[in-house]
Amino acid sequence: MKRTLARYQKSAFRSFIRRHSKYAPIVFFIGGFIFDTLTLGRIDRTYDLTVLCLHMTSLSISLYLYNLADDGTWKNTFLERYEEYLPLAIQFFFGGLSSAYVIYFSRSVSLSKTASFFIILVLLLIANEFLKKRISNKYLQFGVYYFISFTFFTFMIPVFLKELNTTIFLISGAASLVSTLVLLSIIYTKSPSTRKEIKLAKMVFIIIAIYGIINLFYFLKLIPPVPLALDKGIVAHEVIQRNGNYEVTYESEESFIFWRKHKLDFNYSPNQRVYIFSSIFAPTDLKKSIFHRWRRYNSQTKEWETVDDIGYDITGGRDGGYRGYTYKTNVTLGEWEVQVLTEEEQVLGVIGFEIKPRSLQQPLHLKTSKH
């Protein structure tokens, strides 16, 4: 045993970690993020559920072990030799669980849906890099843990209950709040060093404040309806259902490139139908009502005006997303957008386009694809 321990203490990995201790936590955070980005696909797959549940469980255990290490709890046990790796494990699981948002919403047509998460992620990275105590700062540690826990439960509970609504969101928030406070109370009770470093009332206030802010964002419709995601949104000249597929005919334009503005031109002829086709990812057997809100920009008032709300139901489970379309006739020229919304009016995505008069001299470049 002593020989094994001596080899461990002189190992190349241990030496590497000690030499680069300043940057190791941030590397492990990004490593967890990249690992899940490359391996996760569908939130309702057994593999994805297992990985995310293991990440959350391992993160909770790592936090417990790490916070009790300062009290010498693991001295003369096999855990003592691994104590210096616990912060790295915490960073890895933080990164891995954070990546769930990006993975399950990266396919969305509306890039703004994930922008808020990227901002939060950047703030986490900056705070993690520049705070003097980094992950040893327990206020930061439990604040981030609660945010990660909240997002974890907002993914998992709808998948297991096969339902998504405001009540489910509130249940998810309550589950994350209770689990975080239970873990905090256990660590606070068993760790004298933790009781010295933090004020329990302040820590609980921070967690409840995060809970309140997330709920405020939800009711202000600033949080996407996880785990639903908009796969595709197309303004089309024709949509035909044939042999279980949808044949969608639309104008082929470079504007479909994701880094450019999603404002397409629709060359319109009088009395022509304007179609909006959308495919939405939803976990297996999750049922949800979706509707398209057609809005027209009023150039005189400088405001968007709602013209029509047209709905349809979805049942999840299809890899390519559950498909549906709506259409309108006798539309006016100008700027339009169609919001893809849940019945709680949470935005899955926005499809923007401009209706222009069709020139007979200029042929249309139409493309038909199957979905």
Predicted regions mapped to residue ranges:
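Short acidic/polar inter-strand loop motif in beta-rich domains
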Residues: 331, 341-354, 358
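Solvent-exposed serine/threonine-rich low-complexity stretches and specific carbohydrate-binding patches
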Residues: 305-317
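Internal/C-terminal transmembrane anchor helices
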Residues: 195-226
